[in-house]
């Protein structure tokens, strides 16, 4: 039935616009289980209440935890003939075969189907280096997409690294976000996105990220949809003397890390190390500096993280300085708790209040905290990793909108945005 729908949908798209390429993205692992379930049901219908009757109805809430558990064997599983048997007819109906978590088939299917064009339509973020090597090596593989680029509401906790007792893949309320590791729900880039940028050859300078020092020594329950929970910060007040794990991403043969001018050593990086080097030290405030070198020892780039200094205060930065009076235009206002040098404190959690008056209204207000009982429709919200985001909607009348942002112990900030 699914194959027939694939064919009909592809034909409809072609009829509407022959210039469009059509892709059908299939999870071979999930499709294999569905195919087996269908075969079993045809041969021996399950009795009501047996627990087997609804096997075919199980969705990502059932299959994703299995994928998280057996990830190390995924390449072997998707190479099974049954995966090919269950997908070849559907792929034959489209221009591009979208492989969800089936990178283990890229090479073999290039031999089995020489005319098939393949795209990695969904893949695990931690596998970007390995998958991109395949994209560059195999001419019939045209690209790779990661799940997921931008965080979203739903599949709660899919990508979260949880500290404490061992947690299931999906988390109960108050977890509300998937916690995707590339761009958080407020639009802030995370460390994983910079690793992707480096793997793709789009960034020459290295990138430094630090595992949360407030959880130093703890072992998190991990998800294969997140490669790291490190963040680009060397500001960890109250964590002096704790062991620090530092990740440096670099498209370079070697990378050297310095703490307050003292070398912590030089380690291999680049493609042979999946573009990542790991350093360990003891936290002390100051400056972390990473220097990348080519094979000849010549510097190719550097990155620096400094600790915040001075008293924390509110930093408010709107993405736009004016709005259209159309009732729809939005201003995204980034709010952060930072030192006098503008460096954000990731451990700063304060209740922020946003008041909006005039020719606009507060459309939404929140943070990237995946576990929160606060509402996006309220005018108060607690910062997460020192940040929050307010969204102001313009009205239909020209004028100005006044935005007041306040937090305990901080100077109140006021923005006035013209609405024209």
Residue ranges and their predicted role:
Residues 327-333, 399:
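Short, solvent-exposed loop/turn segments enriched in Ser/Thr/Gly
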Residues 302-309, 410-420:
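Short beta-strand elements
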Residues 396-402:
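Short glycine/proline/serine/threonine-rich loop/turn segments at secondary-structure transition edges
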Residues 277-283, 377-396:
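Short, hydrophobic beta-strand segments
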Residues 267-269, 311-315, 355-371:
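Short aromatic-acidic-glycine turn motif
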Residues 11-15, 22-328, 340-345:
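Substrate-binding clefts and catalytic carboxylate motifs of secreted carbohydrate-active enzymes
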